Regions:
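Formylglycine-dependent sulfatase
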Residues: 1-465, 470-471, 484-499
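Bilobed periplasmic-binding protein-like "clamshell/Venus-flytrap" ligand-binding domains
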Residues: 98, 432-435, 502-515
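Intrinsically disordered, low-complexity polar regions and short flexible loop motifs
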Residues: 479
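A glycine-rich phosphate-binding loop feature that marks nucleotide/adenosyl-phosphate handling sites
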Residues: 518
Length: 519
């Protein structure tokens, strides 16, 4: 058999339990079918709870403190991006392409950075620019969806924005994203959007991926990364998908109490917004509001206090955004079938990180690695991959780079922390001890100086804050809702997890990358 094609499909801020196959009441028939036809990893975690670090790790196979993107607002250096799996595949006969949200570089920057994703730099690209970008030969990018503020000049390096504006009606179309249809219940960052689904970025990504498959270089195998930018906040689902799930029928979090007195100190500091520099924190908030069309009330979601009624509407919209993505995933998979590509294409589906979505009284994301934020889906389907299997081995999105190269018949040319998932699928006796993640918060973004490390095994999870030595340890088998912190009770187990953290390769960059913006 010839070398397989590689299709990587990712979503953004998509919890690992928000799929039909996980038992929740979200409609995902096409992704459910993908899981039925392939193997899914039940205990996959993100290497970071933030978009930019996680995506840089997915591309490079490196942990954040090694590739340097430790938080949002820090750009992945192009020379580092060019060492990722896409570049190596491209040099070895694959046609490589990226379509959708990359977020390898920051959007809202303090000054122009020269990248196509930067608001201030994108207008300087030519109308014909289609890559290369971060090792991908071809790139079709977007920012709009999360970023609802129109750019002053045409963003020629951003293809969805370019497409939306081509008839001169871009400003009017963009305004529809933030136009709220009834009912508006005042829930945080939640509304039914007036944007027609045909103009929505999820539909655009589906269309562009299908077009790319039909126009590909047929003499070469392809590696295509299709990156959907939902269900990231704001939860502004378009009709009819915003009405697909009834608020009174959605799944509510089983445990919605914060119980901060039972948690490590930084939980309370985060929720109470105890900034190390209050004036800086206000400045950050004001800058964020100037860049978004988001409601000012609880814009940063630290003091989240929506009612159950409002939370139900948020979850219904979140589900609708997922179902719209699922619809387009189905269209893409149908295109593989119609073009005779499915039998020789490895499909990998995952997300960069999750969302608290009401767990423990929290919303969105931040420095508490509850399962809703940390765990993501990992589904693989393709030649040689068993159907209907569920692996309980702990794995990470950092494994994507090594896995893509392994399926193509290569080993990483550069250092790679991730390990190929192919070995776990090919060898039933193969095991993994743990998966690892890390996040050094940028105090300028968060007002807190935290150095977080997290280790996940099949049964347990421990998070440790390295500056203070505080932490939390949960038995996810007996305590799936993470209500009882065992950190100060299980000294032997805690020591084992500390050893896992210390086993991380000592290859961190020695000079921190300078933030270019907020995100």
């Amino acid at each position: 058999m010839s070398r397989p094609n590689l299709l990587i499909i990712t979503t953004d801020q998509h919890r690992g339990d928000c799929y039909g196959f996980e038992g929740r009441k979200v409609q995902t028939p096409h992704i459910d079918q993908l899981a039925t036809e392939g193997t899914r990893f039940q205990h996959c975690i993100t290497p970071s709870a933030m978009c930019q670090p996680a995506r840089a790790s997915m591309l490079t196979g490196l942990y954040p403190l090694t590739h340097g993107v430790i938080d949002n607002g820090i750009d992945l250096p192009p020379k580092t991006g060019d060492t990722g799996f896409a570049s190596q595949l491209g040099r070895n006969g694959y046609h490589t392409a990226f379509i959708g949200k990359a977020h390898f570089s920051s959007y809202n920057t303090f000054s122009p950075t020269g990248t196509p994703e930067c608001h201030q730099s994108s207008p300087n690209f030519s109308d014909e620019w289609n890559g290369p970008y971060m090792g991908f030969e071809e790139a079709q990018l977007l920012v709009l969806g999360h970023e609802l503020k129109e750019m002053a000049s045409a963003p020629k390096g951003l293809h969805y924005e370019r497409w939306l504006r081509k008839d001169g009606q871009g400003q009017k179309k963009l305004a529809l994203y933030g136009t709220k249809l009834t009912p508006d219940v005042g829930a945080i960052q939640t509304w039914n959007s007036a944007m027609p689904v045909a103009w929505h970025h999820s539909s655009w990504i589906g269309d562009r991926v299908i077009d790319h498959l039909g126009q590909r270089e047929k003499e070469k195998p392809f590696c295509l990364w299709a990156s959907f930018s939902d269900p990231h906040m704001p939860f502004d689902c378009p009709e009819p998908w915003s009405r697909l799930h009834h608020p009174e029928e959605v799944d509510l979090p089983p445990f919605r109490t914060r119980e901060l007195h039972k948690r490590p100190w930084w939980h309370k500091a985060y929720v109470e917004d105890r900034s190390i520099d209050p004036e800086l924190d206000v400045a950050i908030y004001d800058h964020e509001q100037s860049l978004h069309r988001l409601p000012k009330r609880n814009g940063r979601a630290r003091n989240y206090n929506d009612t159950e009624f409002q939370l139900r509407h948020t979850i219904a919209n979140y589900y609708g955004m997922i179902s719209l993505i699922d619809h387009n995933v189905g269209r893409i998979l149908n295109a593989l079938d119609e073009q005779g590509l499915a039998e020789n294409t490895v499909v990998l589906f995952t997300s960069d990180h999750g969302d608290w979505l009401g767990d423990h009284g929290m919303m969105l994301k931040g420095p508490m690695f509850y399962e809703g934020l940390l765990r993501v889906a990992m589904i693989l389907r393709g030649p040689g991959i068993s159907a209907g299997q569920i692996s309980k081995e702990p794995v990470s999105n950092t494994d994507i780079a090594a896995s893509a190269l392994d399926w193509a018949g290569f080993t990483p040319e550069q250092a790679c922390h991730g390990q190929s998932l192919k070995a776990l699928l090919d060898q039933p006796s193969a095991t993994r001890d743990f998966a690892y993640g890390e996040w050094d918060l940028n105090p300028q973004n968060w007002g807190l100086d935290l150095k977080l490390r997290v280790v996940r095994t099949t049964r347990y999870k421990m998070t440790m804050e390295m500056n203070s030595g505080a932490g939390e340890l949960y038995d996810l088998q007996d305590d799936p809702y993470e209500t009882t912190n065992l950190f100060d009770q299980e000294s032997k187990l805690k020591k084992e997890f500390e050893d896992m953290i210390r086993s991380r390769p000592n290859d961190q960059i020695t000079e921190a990358l300078v933030p270019s913006g907020l995100h």
